[in-house]
Design a protein with these regions (language model features):
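Single conserved hydrophobic/aromatic residue that forms the stacking wall/gate
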Residues: 1-6, 10-11
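Short beta-alpha junction loops
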Residues: 8, 32-34, 70, 96-100
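Helix-rich interaction surfaces within compact, conserved domain-sized segments
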Residues: 13-17, 21, 27, 73-121
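Short secondary-structure capping micro-motifs at structural edges
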Residues: 14, 48-53
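N-terminal beta-loop-helix "entrance" segment that forms/cooperates
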Residues: 29-48
């Protein structure tokens, strides 16, 4: 199981500690890798990094993506996250057969759209 996070979040030791305590590896994603497919970033077999460097803007907020994690481990993570009083992250996702082909930027745009919809904006 792994947790992909934007490089800005990698300074948040509290998230790293929760992940490490549960055996979840943390992959810090640099902005230059935002052109890569999430499957490649997560190291999924059959996906490879392409020779493209992302030159766009960074994400406007933090995003956390889980890969290879079952619902029990995800529930444990979220419980520990809350118990440790870590500031909430609005944009969270689990890799699926659909979004595994997306880039971080594409997933962020979709999560942002869903967040606005559920927030009634």
């Amino acid at each position: 199981a792994s947790c992909l996070v934007g490089s800005e979040m990698c300074i948040r030791d509290s998230i790293k500690k929760v992940c490490e305590s549960l055996g979840i590896s943390v992959i810090c994603v640099d902005r230059c890798d935002y052109a890569q497919k999430l499957g490649a970033i997560a190291g999924i077999v059959g996906f490879g990094m392409v020779n493209i460097i992302y030159l766009g803007r960074g994400l406007s907020d933090e995003m956390m993506v889980f890969s290879g994690i079952d619902s029990e481990l995800l529930d444990k993570f979220l419980s520990e996250y809350k118990k440790n009083g870590i500031e909430p992250i609005n944009y969270k996702a689990v890799l699926t057969v659909n979004n595994i082909f997306w880039t971080p930027e594409e997933l962020f745009a979709e999560l942002k759209k869903e967040h606005r919809k559920f927030a009634g904006r």
